[in-house]
């Protein structure tokens, strides 16, 4: 565990809750003190769901500390079983309640004897892993639980080409849009989708996972452990190349073809898809990104520097797109997924000047300040850093704020995703003529303190000391302070604003 003002990846219980609330008819109970139960509000705000988030807090308070948690935890499990009739209840502690070192697994075993639904304890080390690792582990645990429970499995794969998409979940960065784009891609390739988990899936679905011919893992962060388990237990091949960008899209499609050819079972398909012709047609005519990268607009980016930072999947993919497909220099790229550092380094070693593996936003901010790039592509934190340094930033990875949970269709994967990324890159830079005009006219985004007054009265003159004092006031109240001070000065018949006048105005308005 780590005490920090801000973190890229949240605590482990958030990952477990994300997986639980992605499945249909699954309820999560977190054994937590007040303050750790913010997930419900966060998910409702960002995902803008109509339904309530299926998560309940079993509060750790002074009574629990005095008597122990067993009765309260078991009672909460049985109450939710009766009220919601879920297929599964997942119990998880938080990093705070884990300090109590209670045997919650024993409480789950006791409750599962009495309850009508299945109950499992999230087997996650809250001291060692973060939100992403916990989500990956919890999904694998749920799949393993239901496959172990189904002793007699129909091991025959489907006659038609089929796939499981593993790793689409709630609060994922553009995950729902990406899922729609993957559906369209697989339909074009005449591949039937067997299961999509966990988002929108039922916990009864995992027992049918082995029927698919292969598994597709769009993001390394969640789903890879499940795919590796299915590969080990059932010999199912999996594709983990993220279909982001024209080059990796082509590579992903070729790996899909290779995975379909692995199994000896004959494929009965209504049509034979020429994969190479499909790649060529989509790259040349559907995706506008390939054409755009050769246009004069994209050539204007030559020589401009960028910094990329995000989760391993998105940071690596965006770095390769910028350097390989758009010819933009990536001065530094990095990820906060320290557990996946080796894979990340291998992916981007030929596409950037330097790399950073850290979960400390201050280090990232220092690098951005040193490099002074023309644009940043990162998370919500890099967006804040960019605003402070007056550098434009495109958000390409979680964690993100509500503006990146768009209602409109904005995938990052697939051929439509290449268009979205090209737009994001183009709009994140100051355009060529815009740069030129800013130089000529000394910039339109002046740092001078502006007034919003429509009055025709002559404004009092601010002396250098008072201007410096005004500049120290936070921006969100600065204009109001300026207007109130000038109004006070006019009422007193003063032509000059000094620091003393500012203090007098403040006292008069207090």
UniProtKB/Swiss-Prot annotation:
Keywords per UniProt: 4Fe-4S, ATP-binding, Chlorophyll biosynthesis, Chloroplast, Iron, Iron-sulfur, Metal-binding, Nucleotide-binding, Oxidoreductase, Photosynthesis, Plastid
Assembly description: Protochlorophyllide reductase is composed of three subunits; ChlL, ChlN and ChlB. Forms a heterotetramer of two ChlB and two ChlN subunits.
Protein name per Swiss-Prot or TrEMBL: Light-independent protochlorophyllide reductase subunit B
Gene that specifies this protein: chlB
NCBIfam families cross-referenced by the UniProt entry: DPOR_BchB
Annotated transmembrane regions: none
Reaction(s) the record says it catalyses: chlorophyllide a + oxidized 2[4Fe-4S]-[ferredoxin] + 2 ADP + 2 phosphate = protochlorophyllide a + reduced 2[4Fe-4S]-[ferredoxin] + 2 ATP + 2 H2O
Protein residues bound to [4Fe-4S] cluster: 36
Binding site for substrate: 432-433
Active site, UniProt feature: 297 (proton donor)
EC numbers on record: 1.3.7.7
Pfam families: Oxidored_nitro, PCP_red
Function: Component of the dark-operative protochlorophyllide reductase (DPOR) that uses Mg-ATP and reduced ferredoxin to reduce ring D of protochlorophyllide (Pchlide) to form chlorophyllide a (Chlide). This reaction is light-independent. The NB-protein (ChlN-ChlB) is the catalytic component of the complex.
Entry's localization field: Plastid, Chloroplast
The organism's taxonomic lineage, starting at the top: Eukaryota, Viridiplantae, Streptophyta, Embryophyta, Tracheophyta
Organism name: Pinus koraiensis (Korean pine)
Pathway the protein acts in: Porphyrin-containing compound metabolism; chlorophyll biosynthesis (light-independent)
Family the entry assigns: Belongs to the ChlB/BchB/BchZ family.
GO molecular-function terms, A-Z: 4 iron, 4 sulfur cluster binding; ATP binding; metal ion binding; oxidoreductase activity, acting on iron-sulfur proteins as donors; oxidoreductase activity, acting on the CH-CH group of donors, iron-sulfur protein as acceptor
GO biological process, one term: photosynthesis, dark reaction
Details of cofactor binding: Binds 1 [4Fe-4S] cluster per heterodimer. The cluster is bound at the heterodimer interface by residues from both subunits.
Presence of keyword ATP-binding: yes
UniProt keyword 4Fe-4S present: yes
Cofactor: [4Fe-4S] cluster
One annotated Gene Ontology cellular component of this protein: chloroplast
